Amino acid sequence: MLNAFVFLNCDIGTEPAILNEITDISGVSEAVQLSGVYDIVAKVSEQSREDIAKSVRKIRTIANIKSSLTMIVSEEEQQQHSAKQIEERVVQ
């Protein structure tokens, strides 16, 4: 499973409606509203980079999104994190 974080800038006041739309997109595992440089961040979890790209394209078609920045978590980091989670479960 690959993960990416999509940071969004939205038109003022449209954040709640955009959050509702984003959470309906398959592949979006969570999304929250932020204060600061970005208005919303969504976590996308998919099996491949191509599937992540499809989900990001769907997000970017939502009305009132002004810009987006997508950061894909490195595969090495995800593998290390997954191995650590498994190890923690075994120890417990």
Name what the model sees in each region.
Residues 1-92:
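A compositional/biophysical signature of low hydrophobicity enriched in polar/charged and small residues
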